[in-house]
Every structure is written in structure tokens, then in C-alpha cells.
Amino acid sequence: TQPENTDVCVRSIERFGHQVTLLDKKDLERDYGYNREVEDGSTEFTYTRFLVPYLCGYKGRALFCDSDFVWRKDPAILDTIVQDASITVVKHLVKQVREDHKFLAHKNEWYPRKWWSSMMVFNCDHVECSALTLDAVNTQTPQWLHRFEWATDIGRVDESYNYLVGYYNFLKDPVAVHFTDGTPIYTDYAQDEFAEDYNDLR
């Protein structure tokens, strides 16, 4: 991932008084025994995100989001609307990607439940989250993880909490915007919707 994107995302959350914990692959390998290799076209946190319940000791709630998010409003809003599902996401219905490749030449493919795992509220106490062990995250298939084959109790929040820039155009004031194909630091995306929100935090 790009450090500047991460910094912007973190600032967008910390300005509301929240602490952010980054999922650093090297730290997870050293401290916890994470050993999954990164496949071609994947980012380092493609799979580490599913360690969140394990890292939280299967207690409480935890929010994960990709590093190309900007939170325009306090993410704590989610705590007031999320119910008791094992995992809560935006259940995107987009059926195709905008481009074959995105920033850093990562391959951009559509698959069922694409983008659902880019913003997740884990109910770490839920019995279904107990399936996300270190061994499972190290060894299970990408489909099992990202298509939520480990969960049946999947909650939903609306698109305001994971607004896909370049795909959606129906919200004027979303809570969180997701520059999924590329952030405004890249020329091709410099004029994208909500680029100003990103640039204000650079």
C-alpha cells in the first residue's frame, strides 16, 4: 500500500479522537506467526484483515477498513446502528469493475461480494468470528475468507459507509468514501468525486 494513502486514512479517523492500529504484515509474522504468502495482484493486507477478531481476543467490536478510505464523519456512528451480527458490511451490488487494473498495477477483478470486506465491523464475541483463527487465516482459500463462507449472520449498513468513488453517484454527503481504483495522488484520479476531502488531509 502507499504510505501517503495510509496516512490520509489514519488522519481522517484520528481527528475524531479514535485510535488506529495498522495491520503490518512483518509485525504479524514476527509476533503472531502469520505466514501467508501474498498472491500476485494482492496487497499485504488482503488476508491480514481477517485476523482482527483473533488480535482482539475475540472480544468487543472492531472496525476494519482499507487504507484508501477517507472518513468524512465520525466512524463511531456505526456503533449506534450495528446490530449483533457476526460481521456488518456494505453489501455492494456492483457487477463489474471500472478498470482492469488499479493503482500499483494491482489486478482489478470482479467476484461475488467484491468490496464487502473492504469495510467490516466485526462482532468479535460472536461464535462465527471464532472460525477466524490464525491457522484459518493462514491456510483457508481466498473465497472462504472474502466471500464470507465462514459466516451466515452478515449484517448490512447502507452505501454511505463505503461509498465507492467512480461507481456510485447518488450520495452527496457519505460518511466514508473509498477510492478503490486509485486515490487522488494519481493523475488519473485527481479529479474524482470527493478528491478535495482526500487532499485536505494530505
Q: Language-model segments: what does each one mean?
A:
Residues 29-36, 98-101, 165-169:
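Short, solvent-exposed polar/charged micro-motifs at secondary-structure junctions
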Residues 2-3, 7-8, 15-17, 22-29, ...:
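A glycosyltransferase accessory/donor-loop signature
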Residues 112-114, 169-170:
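Extracellular/periplasmic catalytic domains that process cell-envelope and extracellular macromolecules
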Residues 38-41, 104-109:
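Short, P/G- and charge-enriched loop/turn segments at secondary-structure junctions
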Residues 21, 100-103:
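Flexible, glycine-rich active-site loops centered on histidine and acidic residues
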Residues 89-101, 108, 116:
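A gly/proline- and charged-residue-enriched helix-loop-helix capping module
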Residues 21-56:
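Active-site-proximal specificity loops/subdomain of glycosyltransferases
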Residues 48-97, 121, 128:
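GT-A fold catalytic core of metal-dependent nucleotide-sugar glycosyltransferases
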